């Protein structure tokens, strides 16, 4: 059994992508490999085969390994629900919410869960490919660390350090990170990968030579800047990302502070007939064919922000002019009359008035609903697959006209009597070809082109493995992975 860990000099250095690439590359070598991330902080999550939730990046990495996602792949998931606190999910199940100070004291317990999951995976697979979090050199977070070098030291594994050259300062990032590690941690770093390089590698070579001489560690390769990958991100969305013009159907997604599972919109971002725009603070909602209220980790707080930004009035105007509106998960809850949080699960206990566009109310309960589901859309009887991740129980007359008939006999969501509003708890609505096409036609798009989102994702995973073969030192990688 071999464990190899990828750590980064910064957030968004390329850790998730590199782990995905290495997983598929190893699979091509005939090696049974499994992804692992000890601790993840993200609002994008996926439902696992064993009925829990993990970070979405680990679900993509599982696909790279041709495995079903499992809670052991990401034993600790932190889902921020305020500026200072987060819901703590252990082995796929929410156990509590706590602030940063309380979580620091909880890390010993969390580490036990991390090591138990790693032990199970390492007993079942010859290679465990691990992704770190953020940077291992955050001085204020090093005590009790379970996400980076604290984990690497505990399981005695080698580390690859990746840095993003596109941001500038790559040599300072790599050398500075190394300098801030302890002597034993420095010894764990077996080499560097430089990510997102543009230009002639010959111009970079003097810097690479200096880096190897300065640190005594090899550069395992330089990965090129790739602009058109279609793999889900695990962290926050850039509201400037994905803005396209000259498309047929205009779709607007208001970006609220606690937006969750924004990966729901990746298929729309890639669709050639859709102009998808994320609207952030200070931006008015423009005229559009479809507005989608996304999921939220703090529904009442995001409702207040929506009103403060004047977006509630923009949504009402949008509907008056015949536009279509979809609410997904937290967005569904916002569309109703009221949202009640008697236990204070998402902040202070209390109730908030919803937008009042559909006749139902939601009560947030401690037990979270986690399911992968399949069913049929009320629109065109289109096949739909997706997943539920929510703590709310919604009741009311509007549910008598459901949006989805689920295969397990349940109904989901609602469609308004005037057919302008569709609300659902299902994430992943647009990933299926049939359901995506049906929803786009409902929103006003004619002659819809069908895209196979799953095939696009699989193609990109293969492309990443090709980049490993072409640009990294595969002989050294095989040695680090214990592969002959």
Swiss-Prot record:
A single BP term in Gene Ontology: cobalamin biosynthetic process
InterPro entries, per the entry: Class_I_gatase-like (IPR029062), CobQ/CobB/MinD/ParA_Nub-bd_dom (IPR002586), CobQ_GATase1 (IPR033949), CobQ_N (IPR047045), CobQ_synth (IPR004459), GATase_3 (IPR011698), P-loop_NTPase (IPR027417)
Highest taxon above the source species: Bacteria
Domain GATase cobBQ-type: 248-435
Keywords carried by this UniProt record: Cobalamin biosynthesis, Glutamine amidotransferase
CDD domains per the UniProt record, alphabetical: CobQ_N, GATase1_CobQ
Protein name per its UniProtKB record: Cobyric acid synthase
Organism per entry: Pseudomonas putida (strain ATCC 700007 / DSM 6899 / JCM 31910 / BCRC 17059 / LMG 24140 / F1)
């Amino acid at each position: 059994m071999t464990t190899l860990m990828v750590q980064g000099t910064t957030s968004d250095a390329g850790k998730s992508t590199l782990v995905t690439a290495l997983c598929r590359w190893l699979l091509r070598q005939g090696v049974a490999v499994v992804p692992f991330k000890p601790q993840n902080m993200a609002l994008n999550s996926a439902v696992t085969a064993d009925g829990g939730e993990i970070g979405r990046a680990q679900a993509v990495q599982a696909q790279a390994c041709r495995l079903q996602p499992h809670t052991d792949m990401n034993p600790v998931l932190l889902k921020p629900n305020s500026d200072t606190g987060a819901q703590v999910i252990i082995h796929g199940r929410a156990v509590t919410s706590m602030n940063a100070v309380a979580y620091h004291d909880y890390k010993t317990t969390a580490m036990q869960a991390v090591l138990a999951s790693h032990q199970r995976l390492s007993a079942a697979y010859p290679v465990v490919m691990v992704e770190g979090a953020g940077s291992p050199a955050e001085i204020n977070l090093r005590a009790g660390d379970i996400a980076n070098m604290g984990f690497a030291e505990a399981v005695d594994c080698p580390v690859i350090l990746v840095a993003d050259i596109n941001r500038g300062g790559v040599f300072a990032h790599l050398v500075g990170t190394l300098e801030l590690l302890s002597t034993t941690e420095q010894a764990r770093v077996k080499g560097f990968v430089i990510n997102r390089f543009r230009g002639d590698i010959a111009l970079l070579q003097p810097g690479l030579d200096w880096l190897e001489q300065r640190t005594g560690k090899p550069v395992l390769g330089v990965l090129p800047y790739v602009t058109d990958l279609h793999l889900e991100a695990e962290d926050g969305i850039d509201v400037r990302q994905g803005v396209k013009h000259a498309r047929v159907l205009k779709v607007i997604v208001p970006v609220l502070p606690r937006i969750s599972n924004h990966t729901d919109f990746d298929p729309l971002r890639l669709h050639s007939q859709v102009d998808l725009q994320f609207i952030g603070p200070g931006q008015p909602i423009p005229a559009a064919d479809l507005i989608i209220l996304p999921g939220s980790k703090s529904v009442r707080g995001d409702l207040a922000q929506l009103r403060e930004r004047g977006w509630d009035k923009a949504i009402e105007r949008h509907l008056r002019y015949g536009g279509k509106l979809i609410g997904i998960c937290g967005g569904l809850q916002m569309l109703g009359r009221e949202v009640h949080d008697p236990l204070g699960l998402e902040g202070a206990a209390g109730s908030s008035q919803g937008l009042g566009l559909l006749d139902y109310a939601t009560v947030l309960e401690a037990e979270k609903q986690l399911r992968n589901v399949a069913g049929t859309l009320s629109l065109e009887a289109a096949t739909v697959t997706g997943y539920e991740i929510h703590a709310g129980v919604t009741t009311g007359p509007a549910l008598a006209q459901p949006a989805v008939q689920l295969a397990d006999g349940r109904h989901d969501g609602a469609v308004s009597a005037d057919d302008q509003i569709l609300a659902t708890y299902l994430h992943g609505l647009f990933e299926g070809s049939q359901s995506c096409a049906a929803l786009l036609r409902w929103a006003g798009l004619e002659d819809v082109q069908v895209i196979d989102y799953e095939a696009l994702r699989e193609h990109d995973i293969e492309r990443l493995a090709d980049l490993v073969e072409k640009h990294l030192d595969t002989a050294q990688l095989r040695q680090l992975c214990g592969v002959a």
